[in-house]
């Protein structure tokens, strides 16, 4: 049975709604307030009954949906092969599925034959990559997430204004590689508070910071605080760079972790935002694991566990969540309760290369409302 829970902070109440379908479940749906549910219990459940708390929002963000759609539409419109630089999104299931349809994933532009069509991944690319593509006559389709593009634009703006840039993020991530390439001569990357102390800049009064879009909110906050301590006049982005979906999924885990004995995050190991969800859970004292699918679940993890919270990183498809929940059902977790922490209705338009090819109307890029 599936119950549905919305987290509210005021006017706690329980509202019963008619039987309906929620995602891939059908059953009685109950809307209630999470804070009114004691740990290990829920509507029509007992402290000893095994249950799953299915977090919402979870899974695909608007940028990931857009990137995957771009590859699929390109294959349907232009036919295979379509080359894609790096993984279109950081999820092996998604990449393998697109490869079966005819997408060819390459590490660098140099691996694409001259004159062929290539798609840039959602994580963005540096100007140097764009220049190489142009020099080799490649037909480029840009699937960079608009929120990543926003960070690139900010980097260029600050660099032109004479600022030294501090880019907060993980050096080995594709997104950082692309953003760093916008102003490599004036940009330094920091991954933790300790690295802030070692920063040296020509003018401490002309420093600006930017962040990777998939960081932990807590991690970014601590580093930004350290930067402001070191550079009191430091400038920052007009609005925070961390993606709305990254934030929403972390907030969901933060709200539910104390009600769970175990948190399972569906996502690939190279997914930054998925790894951050595990960190959020563990930092709150609840055991958390990152899993690609149900086959990665160690049965020992479930010993003595009555409540399992399940979520998914922004690049993990819902079919993998279904797989995990089905596994848990088969292992006695028959009570599945969907916990909706906040609504999420962000959409991004397709790039002009795709819009023109399919002859559809253009669409302005949507932005999340905070």
Question: Can you say where each PLM-predicted feature lies in the sequence?
Answer:
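Secreted/extracellular small peptides and ectodomain modules produced from precursors
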Residues: 22-23, 59
């Amino acid at each position: 049975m599936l119950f549905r829970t919305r987290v509210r902070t005021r006017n706690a109440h329980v509202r019963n709604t008619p039987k309906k379908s929620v995602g891939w479940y059908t059953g009685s749906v109950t809307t209630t307030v999470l804070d009114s549910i004691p740990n290990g219990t829920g509507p029509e459940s007992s402290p000893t009954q095994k249950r799953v708390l299915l977090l919402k929002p979870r899974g695909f963000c608007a940028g990931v949906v857009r990137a995957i759609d771009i590859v699929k539409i390109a294959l349907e419109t232009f036919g295979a092969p379509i080359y894609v630089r790096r993984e279109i999104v950081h999820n092996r299931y998604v990449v393998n599925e697109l490869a079966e349809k005819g997408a060819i994933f390459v590490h660098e532009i140099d691996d694409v034959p001259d004159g062929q069509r290539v798609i840039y991944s959602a994580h963005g690319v540096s100007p140097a990559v764009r220049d190489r593509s142009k020099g080799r006559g490649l037909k480029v389709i840009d699937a960079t997430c608009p929120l990543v593009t926003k960070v690139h634009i900010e980097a260029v703006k600050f660099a032109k204004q004479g600022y030294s840039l501090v880019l907060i993020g993980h050096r080995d991530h594709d997104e950082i590689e692309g953003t760093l390439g916008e102003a490599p001569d004036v940009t330094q990357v920091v991954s933790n508070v300790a690295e802030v102390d070692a920063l040296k800049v020509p003018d401490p009064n002309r420093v600006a910071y930017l962040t990777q879009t998939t960081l932990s909110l807590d991690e970014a906050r601590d580093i930004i605080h350290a930067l402001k301590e070191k550079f009191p006049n430091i400038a920052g982005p007009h609005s925070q760079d961390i993606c709305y979906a990254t934030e929403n999924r972390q907030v969901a885990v933060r709200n539910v972790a104390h009600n769970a004995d175990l948190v399972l995050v569906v996502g690939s190991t190279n997914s930054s935002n998925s790894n951050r969800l595990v960190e959020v859970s563990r930092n709150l004292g609840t055991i958390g694991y990152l899993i690609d699918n149900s086959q990665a679940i160690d049965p020992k993890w479930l010993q003595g566990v009555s409540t399992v919270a399940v979520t998914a990183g922004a690049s993990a498809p819902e079919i993998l969540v279904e797989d995990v929940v089905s596994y848990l059902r088969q292992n006695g977790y028959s009570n599945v309760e969907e916990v909706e922490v906040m609504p999420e209705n962000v959409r991004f338009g397709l790039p002009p290369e795709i819009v023109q090819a399919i002859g559809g109307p253009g669409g302005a890029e949507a932005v999340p409302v905070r």
